[in-house]
Every structure is written in structure tokens, then in C-alpha cells.
Amino acid sequence: MKPDAHQVKQFLLNLQDTICQQLTAVDGAEFVEDSWQRESGGGGRSRVLRNGGVFEQAGVNFSHVHGEAMPASATAHRPELAGRSFEAMGVSLVVHPHNPYVPTSHANVRFFIAEKPGAEPVWWFGGGFDLTPFYGFEEDAIHWHRTARDLCLPFGEDVYPRYKKWCDDYFYLKHRNEQRGIGGLFFDDLNTPDFDHCFAFMQAVGKGYTDAYLPIVERRKAMAYAERERNFQLYRRGRYVEFNLVWDRGTLFGLQTGGRTESILMSMPPLVRWEYDYQPKDGSPEAALSEFIKVRDWV
């Protein structure tokens, strides 16, 4: 089947609605929507839930941008895109909970297509989801990765191990020599064997995110915590900021190509702290995190 951008867009709009409804059902607070237009073509819906019962901030973005020509920065790496009109669309979200025992989560699914008369379209899907705990619970990590593995299985035995490794490699802070979290799935440039297969996989990832995340939220959201845990959460959120501003390709591409800054930086935690040469106490739960987030096979 030939790529159907309209069908993908409808799925993404519905996915944004569904995820917002599911997060509101857990939290009790409503999302506030900010619709925006892009001067050179397209727009989006940014939705933010702030200071809820469970989530300190949750941002769920839909964007659909299009134009007559790709920016030079993009065609330099992909000369086959030169002279083509393009459409890029996706849903991207980050959830920062109040409770330090509830991990931060991130998910993204996206579609890109570039076309010109008389030529086959160039298209691909990308996306994934990843989890960033502050305190490690093995049962949570196993559930997260089991959900990821199970949604991948109908698409091939090798899909989960391949996209898990890609996720581990991608969400890595080189300047800290550590993982951002315990990973999950990451894929990009997916366009084989055909559109229907790739679209079905992207849908499975989009729908699988809340299956993976919400049971963990329910399990941890009522755990008692004090200032020590909160301070550690804010300190570890600093790693999230460092990754997004230094290493994340999507953030950098968006800022360099004149994307909507408020939407791009919606992934940032609302509060964060840095501390010079912080060393957790030996044997403490805080010290255990550095071992917990090291790459391993969870399932």
C-alpha cells in the first residue's frame, strides 16, 4: 500500500487524546491545550498538565509541519530529499511525577514523508519509549521491558533486542559515562517491508506506552517520601536536562530549524538542581541507582 499521511495523522491525533485521557484518569487534573500554527506550514497541539495529584508536569505534544523544501541542514545528510516537498508529524510526551519513587517516562512516535512529481515518495517511521527511575525496583523494570518485548513479538523475534539496544545506545550521557535510565525501545528510519507493516508497528509502540507505564505509576504513587528523596529526584532530573540539551537529536534539530521553542522544551522538568561533586552515601538507595541503570537484559 502507498504511504497514507492522512491516516497516520488521524492515528496520532487520536493517540494524543487517548494518552491525555489515561493520564488524567490517574491524576485527576486536566490538560490545558495550546494550539499553534507554523508560519512556513503546519502547526500542532501542545497539551500540559501541571501540579496535578500525581504528576508535577506532563506534556503531550502533537505536531504536523510541512513545506515545499527541506532545510539545507537536513538535505546535507540525505541528498535524495533535495527538491522534495515534505511532511513531518508526531506525538511526543514526557511525564515528570511528584513522587520520587515514580519514574519519569518519555515516548515518541513520528512519521516523515518527502515527495516530488514523477518519483516514488521517501518515507519512514520512528519512535520508542524509555523509563528514567530515581529509585530502582526490579519488578517495575521487568514489567516495562516485558511490555516492550511483547508488543514487538508479532513483528519478529529480533525486533525487541535490536530496538532495546538502540535505545540503550541512544539514551547515554557520554560526558557522564552513564545511561539516562533503563531504556526501552528506540527505532528510526523504519520503512521495510512496507507501509502497512511499519505503520502497524508504530501504532503498537504508541499504544504500548501506557500499558508499560501506568501500572508502575499506580504501584508507586502512594509511597511515602521525604526531603532526602525529593532532593535526589531533583538532582537526577539534572541528567535529564543535560541529555536533552547536549545529546538529543530531536531537541537540537528542532531548535536549529526554527521549531516552536516552547513545545520543544516542554520535556524539561519544572524543577531541577545541580550539586558540585555530589556523592551518595555508600550502601544507600541513592547509591544503588548507578548500578541499577547499567545496561542489562531485563527479560
Curated annotation (Swiss-Prot):
EC annotation from Swiss-Prot or TrEMBL: 1.3.3.3
Pfam families noted in UniProt: Coprogen_oxidas
Annotated substrate binding sites: S92, N108, V109, R110, G258, G259, R260
Involved pathway(s): Porphyrin-containing compound metabolism; protoporphyrin-IX biosynthesis; protoporphyrinogen-IX from coproporphyrinogen-III (O2 route): step 1/1
GO biological process: protoporphyrinogen IX biosynthetic process
UniProt keyword terms in alphabetical order: Cytoplasm, Heme biosynthesis, Metal-binding, Oxidoreductase, Porphyrin biosynthesis
Major localization listed first in the record, in broad terms: cytoplasm
Task of the protein: Involved in the heme biosynthesis. Catalyzes the aerobic oxidative decarboxylation of propionate groups of rings A and B of coproporphyrinogen-III to yield the vinyl groups in protoporphyrinogen-IX.
This protein's name: Oxygen-dependent coproporphyrinogen-III oxidase
Biological source species: Shigella dysenteriae serotype 1 (strain Sd197)
